[in-house]
Amino acid sequence: MEIQHHNRYPFSALTERPVYDWPEGKRLAVCLCHNIEWFSFMTGLGSDHTLPGAPQTTRNYAWRDYGNRVGIWYLFDLLDELRLPASHNINAAVLEHCPQIIKRIQARGDEVIGHGVTNSERQDIMDEVAERTMITQTTDSITKHFGAPPKGWLGP
């Protein structure tokens, strides 16, 4: 078998790289970023990982729904307590269904990253027209709700 190389960049060992410092001479940067997602109930992607190949179930939908209803609020409280900024990869559908989350992100002044309309679809299997439509819908929704376009993108 012929081994293929990506040819995007040459190999470089850490021991041979130049020293890099972050602003203000800092040696370490940490990015706190999490996904805030919305799934279509019982349709689309979102299978139960305990049953590979099985269709979506009420149980795995509930795991995800818990995050928006309960889990995220504990996370916001912890971030506030530790005075840590965060970035949020957010599905556009969350903005329509969970307006309280928008208010908390705005109050904290956190960064918003586009993450598709829902996580019931996959960007990597879309044709160009569908992908462009999804990116535009997501960007427009984030801009409408936050007053500015997303700072970045993480495909669903």
Regions found by a protein language model. Give the residues of each.
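Catalytic alpha-helical scaffold of carbohydrate-active enzymes acting on polysaccharides/glycoconjugates
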Residues: 2-156
